[in-house]
Amino acid sequence: MSKHTVLFELGCEELPPKSLKTLRDALQVETVKGLNEAGLNFASVEAYAAPRRLALKIVDVDAAQADTQKRFDGPAVQAAYDAEGKPTKALEGFMRGQGITVEQLSTFQAGKVEKVCYLKDVKGQSLDALLPQILQTALDNLPIAKRMRSAASRTEFVRPVKWVVLLKDDQVIEATIQDHKAGNVTYGHRFHAPEAVTLAHANDYLAALEKAYVVANFEKRQATIQEQVKKLADEVNATAIVPADLLDEVTSLVEWPVALRATFEERYLAVPQEALITTMQDNQKYFCLINAEGKLQPYFITVSNIESKDPTQIIEGNEKVVRPRLSDAEFFFLQDQKQPLASRKEKLTNMVFQAQLGTLWDKSTRIAKLAVALSSITGANPADAEKAALLAKCDLTSELVGEFPELQGIAGTYYARIEGENTEVSEALGEQYLPKFAGDVLPKTKTGTTIALADRLDTLVGIFGIGQAPTGSKDPFALRRSAIGILRLIIENELDVTIEELVNLALQSYGDIVKDHDKTRADAVAFLEGRYRAKYEDQGVAVDVLQAVQALAPKSPLDFDKRVNAVNHFRTLPEAAALAAANKRVANILAKEAASEGSVVEANLVEDAEKALFAELQAVTPVVEPLLTAKDYTAALSKLAALRAPIDAFFDGVMVMADDADLKANRLRLLAQLRNLFTAVADVSVLQG
């Protein structure tokens, strides 16, 4: 069967930049699905996207479906012919329905019954006949939240469609897609090459468009932007900040990228750089430049869609546009400094945190009380912790945060520095919200750690205290994410404290606001402990490792983490699988037999294998116990791994359930001693493989 290269392009008005890549990928997936369902083989489907077009190149696709044979089942052979071998009325009716003669009949075996059938040859449909509907279905299935219809069209799409190209090699496939007749004419850059571009062959698409100032390949266009941005940054000894989502959006805004470096007045560098970066990235789609120390430089890079003969005009135009935005940020910053942070608490008394839990000032005072209590655990200075807690939410009333909500905490840090607060206090204001997401950095200061922990605990315990715990997909206070943050703050700062102790401290700050302390405590502790799985699964830890540790129900997150790391390491040892299986066998034996308490009686050890295992246990126990006391669980399990050989020998050569009651009881005690050594770390019997 012959193979062809197909090109499909849908030309539109400018597509939504934040959706362009998603639309391209979805079109590719849906088209591949349609081709597969139609039984059309192909080598690959390449997808392209630019602001005014979505396109596909289908390589080496079949010219048509393969011919097939369809079976139509008739009556059983026994009922199809009479005693003389002539067709019965049942068979005649079947033949009439199919429009066939006796000579065209076949038979097949259906279980124990032989039946008559008609095998009809079905010729496969051509690519030309199938492809238009495959593409239209793919377009209909694109993830478009809101479709629009142009005045001249009955069909809907994310933006009005202007043209359609559908080529099979050098031939146009006759089709109407999105109410537009397909052809071989596309269009170049809106300004550089607005005239029609006739495609002689499907393979000419990318090259023909590049001659018309359109880079249709998204990845190539993006790589060009990255190269140009880096070159411009290198020229001023700086590094560009290039967030992935911003790069995707800028790539989706231009057909012919031309990066240009512009400047802004150095006086704006006195404004918190986070505010400047936010406004330039979010509002203007600029790439900001920083030096080796991470300090913002007075430059930005804009990506134009035009290769101008006078790029200075474009640069100056962007500088003129950005100046008012930077001036606004500067104004807010200067205005805020007229009112000290501490004096803003009055405004917090009018800002509701949660109807039943009070205002943001109520929350601040609770956090302050809790932070002082936590200081003995985190090692923070209690006075610093209290002051930082009382100032923590004050910047929420500032003009700067009102304009740039993502600067909450960060703005407070700047204002606290200006007011002369010490580093622990000022940095804690920005660090209180860390970590913001999975894998985010943690606070660097002890005071920041204390406030971050206190803030999350206050919210979690308070929300549980009023009976509004997360349910299903509803988690308005982001308590699931907050709980993982609490666990990380404890574990990564090596805080030796139990979850229940922390919850109790938070409950003390609430007093009578929370009516049922016992239920709140139990629910909050269970919720936090339930987040271990999400935390460790994000790190790639296997579920059975968690189950092995959870079987012991450690109270301290730090202790839990050490055990998880130990079991994770244990799984990599060559002895692990055999020891896990042996532990499972031991656990099953001991579960059925109650008489396993007490010490092993050495005189009742009669088999060499049980004597050897006892000797090994006697030797390893004084080595392992200090490691357990020091919570060096990894080393403890590594030492216990040496027991594999004597354990294997024991089960190979010793009958645990001996007829002699004393021997049986002694062997059960020996196994219990072995089991207890392992379960001092985790229940390794639950490990798989």
Swiss-Prot record:
In which organism is this protein found? Acinetobacter baumannii (strain SDF)
As recorded in Swiss-Prot or TrEMBL, the protein's gene is named: glyS
Q: Which reaction does it catalyse?
A: tRNA(Gly) + glycine + ATP = glycyl-tRNA(Gly) + AMP + diphosphate
Protein name (Swiss-Prot/TrEMBL): Glycine--tRNA ligase beta subunit
Q: Which molecular-function annotations from GO does this UniProt entry contain?
A: arginine-tRNA ligase activity; ATP binding; glycine-tRNA ligase activity
One Pfam annotation reads tRNA_synt_2f
Q: Does the keyword Protease apply?
A: no
Compartments annotated for it: namely: Cytoplasm
Checking NCBIfam families in the record gives: glyS (TIGR00211)
GO cellular component terms listed in the entry, alphabetical order: cytosol
